[in-house]
Curated annotation (Swiss-Prot):
Binds 1 zinc ion. It comes from Salmonella arizonae (strain ATCC BAA-731 / CDC346-86 / RSK2980). This is DNA gyrase inhibitor YacG. The keyword Metal-binding applies. Belongs to the DNA gyrase inhibitor YacG family. Interacts with GyrB. The keyword Lyase does not apply. Inhibits all the catalytic activities of DNA gyrase by preventing its interaction with DNA. Acts by binding directly to the C-terminal domain of GyrB, which probably disrupts DNA binding by the gyrase. GO terms for molecular function: DNA topoisomerase type II (double strand cut, ATP-hydrolyzing) inhibitor activity; zinc ion binding.
Length: 63
């Protein structure tokens, strides 16, 4: 018995079969994949962090 995993495209929300039949997974198409890449490149998306590092955070490359 083969279970088929289906996910939603992160760009448009269409259902996408997670397998060899969907070469752009988790995206439904090359278009949605490129839209997502463009959002990352334009810094519209970011990975959350605990805070920004600055020169005053008591660290240095010099020892």
């Amino acid at each position: 018995m083969s279970d088929v995993t289906v996910v939603s495209c992160p760009t448009c929300g269409k259902p996408v079969v997670w397998g060899e039949v969907s070469p752009f997974r988790p995206f439904c198409s090359k278009r949605c994949q490129l839209i997502d890449l463009g959002e990352w490149a334009a810094e519209e998306k970011r990975i959350a962090s605990s805070g920004d590092l600055s020169d005053s955070d008591d660290w240095s490359e010099e020892r």
